[in-house]
Amino acid sequence: MANTPEPLTTEAAQVVSETDLGAAKLLEPSALWLEPYQWVSVAMLVLIAIMLWKKVPSLVTGGLDNKIAEIKAQLDEAKALRAEAEKLRDEYTAKIANAEKDAEAMMENARHEADAILEKAEADSKALVERRKKMAEDKISAAERDAVDEVRATAAAAAAAASRKLIAEKHDAEADRKLADEVIAEL
């Protein structure tokens, strides 16, 4: 520890005592028989008198009154703005509630419309299936009729051809005469 401070040593303390052994008394300055504290009081009274004469308190109170009026106006404006904000908040809250109700009503209406469309589509599809089924049945019955008519026509043609062949084979001119005579006799 190379840099340690050394303690300060002084000479032996000397005792000094004060005694009032006829020392002269200190006189304070005075002017016009007034002490300094009295002059301070007079100066303050003069300052206050000048302030009152120049109407400083009324200026201060007027300034304070103006500031109070300004603050009151700001407070009134703030109250009006707050009331307007609360009114707008209530209005928008009501609008949001109405919008939610409208949205719910729209959703309910959309559900009903979707159900109605679904029911109509089911009914239409059933009707379409029935129509197609009837058309198929009609086509089948028409095809059956055509087939029956064709079979009948073929059978009639075959019967006529067979009859002609049989008549041609078994009937001769004499048999024709005999048949014609019988038919005439019946008439």
Swiss-Prot record:
Disulfide bonds: none annotated. It comes from the Bacteria. The keyword GTP-binding does not apply. The chain crosses the membrane at residues 36-53. It is a single-pass membrane protein. One of its GO terms (molecular function) is proton-transporting ATPase activity, rotational mechanism. One of its GO terms (cellular component) is proton-transporting ATP synthase complex. It is found in: Cell inner membrane. The keyword Glycoprotein does not apply. F(1)F(0) ATP synthase produces ATP from ADP in the presence of a proton or sodium gradient. F-type ATPases consist of two structural domains, F(1) containing the extramembraneous catalytic core and F(0) containing the membrane proton channel, linked together by a central stalk and a peripheral stalk. During catalysis, ATP synthesis in the catalytic domain of F(1) is coupled via a rotary mechanism of the central stalk subunits to proton translocation. Component of the F(0) channel, it forms part of the peripheral stalk, linking F(1) to F(0). F-type ATPases have 2 components, F(1) - the catalytic core - and F(0) - the membrane proton channel. F(1) has five subunits: alpha(3), beta(3), gamma(1), delta(1), epsilon(1). F(0) has four main subunits: a(1), b(2) and c(10-14). The alpha and beta chains form an alternating ring which encloses part of the gamma chain. F(1) is attached to F(0) by a central stalk formed by the gamma and epsilon chains, while a peripheral stalk is formed by the delta and b chains. PANTHER family: ATP SYNTHASE SUBUNIT B (PTHR33445:SF1), ATP SYNTHASE SUBUNIT B', CHLOROPLASTIC (PTHR33445). Belongs to the ATPase B chain family. This is ATP synthase subunit b. It comes from Erythrobacter litoralis (strain HTCC2594).
